[in-house]
């Protein structure tokens, strides 16, 4: 099987970090269904890369739906999160913006989310709408449904500022899990 891998390159073109997607996109959306695990193996470790600008947490696409991963990256030192994605049109319309803004707010991180757009293999349609989100959850730049480049000026001091205003990472506490309810 293959790995759905995100690579981070330095300014000399050398690979300085590799992340293998942990959560496989195995879903049934009604008209569309996907079983990413049929062709890809899942990763087993979170990746935090040191960059000249600070810690960068690296994830991929469907990982976005698992907030504990992002909280762990932020608590380990990430001030920025990279989330390259290929959300489907139905899931993108419903969830893309709110999930990215939530991860930025929960972690107090900048979120960089490049997103595939268009129709692939004549059937799979991806949403696009690349985003850059600040630690307060404000969208700084957004792409559309066609290929393009987005950019935004960022102030990394906004990470500390957001975390001082709402110090949820410091307030995080362990807790006992509830017993599972019986299901029919």
Pin down the residues of each PLM region.
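CN hydrolase (nitrilase-like) catalytic-core segments centered on the catalytic cysteine
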Residues: 55, 61-150
């Amino acid at each position: 099987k293959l790995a759905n891998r995100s690579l981070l390159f330095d300014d000399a073109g050398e690979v300085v970090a590799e992340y293998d997607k942990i959560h496989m996109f195995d879903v049934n959306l009604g008209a569309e269904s996907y079983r990413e695990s049929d062709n890809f193996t899942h990763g087993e470790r979170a990746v935090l890369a040191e960059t000249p600008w600070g810690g960068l947490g690296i994830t991929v696409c469907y990982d976005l739906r698992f907030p504990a991963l992002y909280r762990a990256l932020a608590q380990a030192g990430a001030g920025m999160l990279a989330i390259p994605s290929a959300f489907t049109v139905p899931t993108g319309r419903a969830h893309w913006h709110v999930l990215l803004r939530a991860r930025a707010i929960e972690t107090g991180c900048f979120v960089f989310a490049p997103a595939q757009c268009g129709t692939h293999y004549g059937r799979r349609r991806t949403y696009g709408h690349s985003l850059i989100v600040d630690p307060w959850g404000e969208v700084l730049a957004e792409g559309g449904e066609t290929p393009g480049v987005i950019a935004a000026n960022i102030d990394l001091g906004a990470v500390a500022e957001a975390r001082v205003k709402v110090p949820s990472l410091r307030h995080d506490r362990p807790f006992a899990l509830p017993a599972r309810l019986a299901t029919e």
